[in-house]
Curated annotation (Swiss-Prot):
It comes from Oryza sativa subsp. japonica. InterPro entries: Cyt_b/b6_N, Cyt_B6_PetB, Cytb/b6-like_sf, Cytochrome_b_N_euk/bac, Di-haem_cyt_TM. The gene is petB. GO terms for molecular function: electron transporter, transferring electrons within cytochrome b6/f complex of photosystem II activity; metal ion binding; oxidoreductase activity. This is Cytochrome b6. The chain crosses the membrane at residues 32-52, 90-110, 116-136, 186-206. Heme 1 (or BH or b566) is high-potential and absorbs at about 566 nm, and heme 2 (or BL or b562) is low-potential and absorbs at about 562 nm.
Length: 215
């Protein structure tokens, strides 16, 4: 076993990587509130796992979406638990993200030289809100349908470009299959990919610059 480890160590310098991860200096003023960002990440990972599990049963069509969600909740093995955890962790992710933003702002974590870390965090906050908007519509029940209709209708108040924006969001002049398809694609592919990219940037900058000092 040691020979196998030595082989990998010679090529990848595993020990140096492990030392860098485990020996990072943690300032003495750090408390439990500095864990809010990590909790938000944990919620996101739970979202990915449970969301992926539901894609095996969910059908993104206006005629089958609601019935497929009912199937997940009533017939699929542990489907009710997986969807419930998905919903609870979604609410928890939003709450932890908001508290994390407040913590960073109140402790001055956005100041020089951490401006870019703050910017990526703001982008992540917008992406988190977008998850909520797109995911809310996927069951395609009365609440989801009218929520989509209202949200996608908001840009219509913008002069000149309002109507084209509404049609871009909906995929057509009215809410229908094109809208559900777009929201499903955003929720399951585009937003998770963007979130993963910006989270990686966020964490790399934190690793590089360290945790901000006390006020």
């Amino acid at each position: 076993m040691s020979k196998v480890y030595d082989w990998f160590e010679e090529r990848l310098e595993i020990q140096a990587i492990a030392d860098d991860i485990t020996s990072k200096y943690v300032p003495p003023h750090v408390n439990i509130f500095y864990c809010l960002g990590g909790i938000t990440l944990t919620c996101f990972l739970v979202q990915v796992a449970t969301g992926f599990a539901m894609t095996f049963y969910y059908r993104p069509t206006v005629t089958e979406a609601f019935s497929s969600v009912q199937y997940i909740m009533t017939e699929a093995n542990f489907g009710w638990l997986i969807r419930s955890v998905h919903r609870w962790s979604a609410s928890m992710m939003v709450l932890m993200m908001i508290l994390h933003v407040f913590r960073v702002y109140l402790t001055g974590g956005f100041k020089k030289p951490r401006e870019l870390t703050w910017v990526t965090g703001v982008v992540l906050a917008v992406l988190t809100a977008s998850f909520g908007v797109t995911g809310y519509s996927l069951p395609w029940d009365q609440i989801g349908y009218w929520a989509v209709k209202i949200v996608t209708g908001v840009p219509d108040a913008i002069p000149v470009i309002g109507s084209p924006l509404v049609e871009l969001l909906r995929g057509s002049a009215s809410v229908g299959q094109s809208t559900l398809t777009r929201f499903y694609s955003l929720h399951t592919f585009v937003l998770p990919l963007l979130t993963a990219v910006f989270m990686l940037m966020h964490f790399l900058m934190i690793r590089k610059q360290g945790i901000s000092g006390p006020l």
